[in-house]
Amino acid sequence: MAKPLATAAASSFPPAEILEILTQVTTLLKSRKETISIAETACGGLLSSSLLSQPGASGIYAGGLTLYTLPSRVAYAGWTQETIANYRGPTTDIVSGLAKHVRRDLASTYTLAESGTAGPTGGNTPNRKPGYVALAVDCERGTFVRELNTELGGDRTANMVRFAVEGLTLLRDVINGEAKL
């Protein structure tokens, strides 16, 4: 017979760094009766699972896709072989396209999309260095983008958490009307 999980282990998710901004976002979405969908790559499901860990998630979460591989983007995000041939790593154009596609398909109020280089390895261009992330939130008002480097180097898990925090922060700013197109 399997042992039950310890209470401390069960309560350590979502990561503490995410919890404050996550609570702000879910409270806003619930109060406005709006919905969110997610298209994530480098976060690997962290955004969706964090949102789903919150009470009342079924009222705000329209769905999500973890589009980590290029073939998954062809299958689920409308990418073509031409898109793949021209792919040069994560950019704001890439995440804008993902956000628009997923919002259209899932009919959510907002879609948050992210794509980045979590590490530990990467490439030589700025958008392929560990810590780089491109973010987009698509909604009726337009597509809001942000890009940054976490400066966390090749710490894969720390980058994934920071990407999630930054994505949720952009989402909060868009919901509150504080983000600029």
Task: Annotate each language-model stretch with its function.
Residues 2-181:
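Short alpha-helical segments enriched in small residues
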